[in-house]
């Protein structure tokens, strides 16, 4: 990417110059206020101007973008295959592993395998988790846990499921939440804003949801309580300007309107917003959705190049297995879990201790979330 700097009087002027001079291949990367002497070196005549850094995409950038799109197409095709096999067979053939006879597992291992399946984890994935947690006991000629059950299963789940445990400490600059209607994106964004601020991050919030007045007012009121800047963007250009105005923030949270993953036109419209800057997109899914609906959402929202997953409404299902299956099969890192409407209490930063407890224990025993955030 070729970098150029221009000096202007306002962000609006910068955008107009960039569009006229560089066209669609350019993006504004950052801006800062500087002072320039108008008459020699006399400091009293220094004028404030805006220095804007512009990135112009070159052939190599387009090649990398093409490669990313090709990888994205492969991921979507793989998800389509998974969905079709789940519809037709109830399982994914490619996950078939070497089955061990029931007598080859120690009794306690069999109990935990049953518990995983009862929690709605796919039998193939449950077997994989159990096998990775076990070693062969030569004396008794059975497979048993390598350590205590919790420790062994935690190590296995850590091997098979990706979590981003550093999301709050080291967030991307711009975090956008997308997902189907009704999964709780706006409430989740408010919870994240509180967590980031609690961890000494300078936070900004931008809403792209121009359809729901109630959601806008709710988020605006919360931003005022947190004392963080809040903006509403009704166009990609306005969004670009607001991102630049919040360039001093450590993390900028972007709320989007809920969209049906079948509404391709609305999704394409949202895509135009995300072309203006380097944005990390996190797909928000309710844990009580059917597994097939989750995969369908991932396929459609996959056009945004998903950086990770957020699972909400864990309090509304006693069977978190579908969530585990999706995380395992897509290998997208999970960044947080939410449960309930209370802000900021009902959120847990993704961590393996919580996930193992969620899978192995009853809902009431894992509900105290704030201690783990």
From Swiss-Prot:
Family matches, as CDD domains: FlhF (cd17873)
Source organism, top-level taxon: Bacteria
GO molecular function: ATP hydrolysis activity; GTP binding; GTPase activity; signal recognition particle binding
GO CC, alphabetical: plasma membrane
GO BP term, pick one: SRP-dependent cotranslational protein targeting to membrane
Topology relative to the membrane: Peripheral membrane protein
Keyword Protein transport attached: yes
Record key words, sorted: Bacterial flagellum biogenesis, Bacterial flagellum protein export, Cell membrane, GTP-binding, Membrane, Nucleotide-binding, Protein transport, Transport
Pfam families: SRP54 (PF00448)
Gene3D superfamilies given in the database record: Flagellar FlhF biosynthesis protein, N domain, P-loop containing nucleotide triphosphate hydrolases
Compartments (UniProt record): Cell membrane
Positions with a binding annotation for GTP: 179-186, 255-259, 312-315
Keyword Transport appears in the UniProt entry: yes
Family of the protein in this entry: Belongs to the GTP-binding SRP family.
Protein name from the UniProt record: Flagellar biosynthesis protein FlhF
Organism of origin: Aquifex aeolicus (strain VF5)
UniProt lineage: Bacteria, Pseudomonadati, Aquificota, Aquificia, Aquificales
Gene: flhF
